[in-house]
Amino acid sequence: MANADLDLYARPQKRIRINRRRWINLLDLGEGGPTVVLCGGDRSTTLIWARVQSELARDFRVVAYDRAGLGFSDPGAFPRTTRRIVGDLRAALRAAGIEPPYVLVGASNGGFETRWFARHHPDEVTGMVLVDTTADDWTLRQQAAAPSWRPAWRNYLNQLRYVADCARSGSLRPGLAEYAQYVPQPMAQLPEALNDRRRDEALTPGYWRTHISECEAIEAASAAGGVDTRALLGDLPLVVLSAGVRIAPPLPNDEVRAFLATLEAGQEALVALSTLGVRHCIADSGHNIQIDRPEAVIAAVTEVVAMTGTRAS
């Protein structure tokens, strides 16, 4: 896709009114069913799918959107729980006249969104792709494997609150250590307009408030785990994509090994959510597979659509 075409992700696409006060930004491309719905991870907007959506749209109708408080969507009610996020998405799809069934694609924490959607609205979902996401009980897993992880996580959230304060005061600028650490740096795979948009959005306090709330909500939900999730999605066609290149948080060396082993176990747990679950490790990709290896995500969606013909009636 030419950079001129990718630049459309740097501006509002189609703002959909979901109630009397709020609008959700949505990008709808292509034709053909089932409709593919793309759900990004932390701080992600439609532009994280810029290298995937147009290619998928050659064969399917493909929808990407900005969650409330991010991109060109209006803020939503707090806290930003997965339930509220899915409610916004379903309202936007209905208001835009985009009917199910859907193949849901969730990247990173967007996987919590897609799984919640499928569990509570199974008749609307015909397949799922999870792109380097984590298990529902990841908080419990990491706490058990790496005791230093929880204090490191709390410190991370406190740092984000400070960054939000800097954004509010206008001091989040080049030269500040937190600017270099937390404001998205340019991605070589994206054109200048998209990298500029990613940077500019991160200078707004609402961006950080939304991100912090989403992190806290997912942490709280995953800490309440303990539910046997095996085959929880039944025979839903499911492909799990796992990054082959991992970066661990700052932990003691012995805990880093345990942390990474727990991530690996979590990937296998995701596969077990469906009796039709399969997994592919993308050896040369980091966490953002949709940016590093977009063809892997495209192939996974095609695989899931092919699997839909194997479901029990």
Which residues does each predicted region cover?
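N-terminal cap/lid segment of alpha/beta-hydrolase-fold proteins
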Residues: 3-23
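Conserved HGGG/HGGXW glycine-rich cap/lid loop of the alpha/beta-hydrolase fold
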Residues: 22-72, 107
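Catalytic active-site module of serine/aspartate enzymes centered on a nucleophile-bearing elbow/loop
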Residues: 274-313
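Flexible "cap/lid" subdomain of the alpha/beta-hydrolase fold that forms the substrate-access gate
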Residues: 129-269
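Conserved hydrolase catalytic core segment
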Residues: 100-143
